[in-house]
Amino acid sequence: MPWPWRRKSRRTLARIAIEGPIAGGTRVRVLKAIEQVQERECPALLLRIDSPGGTVGDSQEIHAALLRLREKGCRVVASFGNISASGGVYVGVAAEKIVANPGTITGSIGVILRGNDLSRLLKRIGIRFETVKSGLYKDILSPDRALSEAERQLLQELIDSSYGQFVAAVAAGRGLEEAVVRGFADGRVFSGAQALPLGLVDVLGDEESARRLAAELAGLDPEKTRAVTFGKPPRKLLGLLPGATLLQQLSQSLSLELAWNGQPLWLHRP
């Protein structure tokens, strides 16, 4: 049931930003921000997404929270920035409307799981692993050996299950048939302009266009409605240093490889 139009916050447009890879820290911050938006009964939410995606479970939890927020009567509009791919798309399709820049990189609908076979390197430097396990597949993706065909099949079934969940969410969120979504959900990326005729986005425009659309959907005057950001991402000290952007990118890439190795991901990885 929609919220009553009484509080001053009912004239406030909420804004939440998702920046960078979606993982545990992002999930905690965004879920808390969504809870604050619900408590203040803001009539609309502008969801700014600039993310290549991330872990499956974290993306699903944010998606589910956004759907619950909409059920409470909050109008949700997603604004895609430089990139909103893979898990960024999964989160975005929970919105009522999606606005993307013509040059936004989006799509990359699919699942990826990577592991490292370091057996030849380990043998060369004289390191050998000793493994005691409770079941045949307990050490699957162990770096000291290659995958067996049975293990590869097991992981493919896992990937296919996650992929099916992704396709179903996009189809439901965008009002498309699953067969149509599967036609372009093969990991390829699109510009915002290419995504429009596919039905992945509703409008081409910038964040201001998305803000105005969110206000209009909530019955507010776009000229008089201010946006208040909830759950601001913490500023990192690294960002204050010269050459910080490159350092952050390198640090981020290394962190992803170490932390997410062996996990199914909804992530665009060029």
Which role fits each region the language model picked out?
Residues 1-87, 91-101, 112-270:
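N-terminal organellar transit peptides
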